[in-house]
Curated annotation (Swiss-Prot):
SUPFAM superfamilies named among the record's database cross-references: SurE-like
Root EC class: hydrolase
Summary of the function given for this chain in its UniProt record: Nucleotidase that shows phosphatase activity on nucleoside 5'-monophosphates.
Protein name: 5'-nucleotidase SurE
Entry keywords, A to Z: Cytoplasm, Hydrolase, Metal-binding, Nucleotide-binding
Recorded superkingdom: Bacteria
This enzyme's EC code(s): 3.1.3.5
Comment on bound cofactor: Binds 1 divalent metal cation per subunit.
UniProt record similarity statement: Belongs to the SurE nucleotidase family.
Cellular location(s): Cytoplasm
Amino acid sequence: MRILLTNDDGIHAEGLAALERIARTLSDDVWIVAPETDQSGLAHSLSLSEPLRLRKISDKHFALRGTPTDCVIMGIRQVMDIKPDLVLSGVNSGSNVADDVTYSGTIAGAIEGTMQGVRSFALSQAYLYEDGARIVPWEVCETHAPALLEKLMDLDLPEGTFLNLNFPNCRPGEVDGAEVTMQGKLAFNLQVDARSDGRGFPYYWLKFGERAGAFIEGTDIHALKHNKISVTPLKLDLTDYSVTDRVARALGYGAQV
């Protein structure tokens, strides 16, 4: 089995090293095409206004000046001579749950793999932020991901569907199993931090405020809060079929499929 790895935290990220160790429990044929620099929050974006620069680190390790989406395309279309059987994106430093999935470059890696016709998984590890530092328990995903992936790899998923795996912030022995979940809802409360440079010109940082949400049973955020691994099936089709008829009636058309 051929496995292609990517991430959004960059080629030197601890989570990518963890993902490689996870992948090597499944196969010896592991390839990496990951961003040269941190691409967090770039979602499913493409580099269209500048060239992609590929740097070979070793026979199956490459760094790309591009987004996670670019990396998967380059891996499948340029770097690998034979299409991979599996795309793994991650392991992200921090969970990708609720509305996070719309911003996430980690999720985008799995989206692009799915669009390329390859079974794909996104993996993310929740962490504790304490005294201005991230404390990421990588051993949780490394302990539990291999067996989980073994069970899920041969699952007959519909076309256009991939799985989003999130690992809780706890010790490996405290994980209370895995739960199939749906997306929860968290308010991002993004704020703008306005500053001035040395010449008095303004510049801005986006920063996160307090995140609030309803930890409803069955959601990804509820699972993580209760030390469970969340497994959320996501699909590329964003159509809201529940309102198509209402929209059609508002426009004076008949019922839609």
